[in-house]
């Protein structure tokens, strides 16, 4: 197992000095965080915590991921029990593993090593009902954390939507300050499940926004003028009412793939969180026609093709580095 080498703090767009953690007394607060899962998002969580002065021990099933993390100042653990053994009392553990069975499997391994004073954070895209169940079943205090920002969070920080006990949230505030864009980039949404509920709806809104941009650019693409779509996106994103990060990614897509999106397929993957959003809306008798139509377009994209769907396919790579399906 590689030996941990502490790396110097780096200054980013949100400088480390802006994200220093302090106790109510004004004294610096360096916490010891355990991170389980060093994929794209988990590694960013660990890196930003280390950059802010916190100690991080991490476990991943990939030996390569652990070796790379060790080179970056993260203490590698040989197993989940080994990770738990390195942490103090209370233990602070952040799960960043795929939703569903992997979360339950990690919690099962952690269970013998947890006490009521510990805090476990699930930063993945879990269903809010699963988070409610896990909070009730887990000995430790449980925080469900909707995480938005994709790989760009490495530089900018994430937006964190957190549910669970208020005392646990306050204890981990220094870590949330480090991982998020700053103090304004995270908040407690409510009790267990609320964080992942808000993130679910966030994803539904994201579907509708992607669909709207896709339809607009499809009309421009098929319209009566020979337009430079990259220039349109750039112009819109400088002062227009509809400016956004997604629109920046539209500009990037046209610049890198060309005005016709090259060989980008019309197959748009994903859809689970959008499905959850629509089901919840039906249960609550809330009309969400834009989200519903966007979800339907995504499913239809797997059968036939449109320019708007090809753009949505490419945008998923832009914000989340998801696979681009190509012809």
Summary of predicted features, one role per range:
Residues 56, 76, 142-143, 288:
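Hydrophobic beta-strand scaffold residues
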Residues 106, 126-204, 211-214:
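Rossmann-fold dinucleotide-binding core
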Residues 15-17:
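Serine residues within intrinsically disordered or low-complexity segments
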Residues 4-7, 19-91, 151-153:
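NAD(P)+-binding Rossmann beta1-loop-alpha1 motif at the extreme N-terminus of oxidoreductases
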Residues 31-38, 45, 178, 317, ...:
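ATP-dependent carboxylate/acyl-activation modules
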Residues 40, 61, 74-133, 154-163:
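Rossmann-like NAD(P)-binding element
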Residues 171, 193-322:
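Helical "substrate-binding/catalytic lid" subdomain
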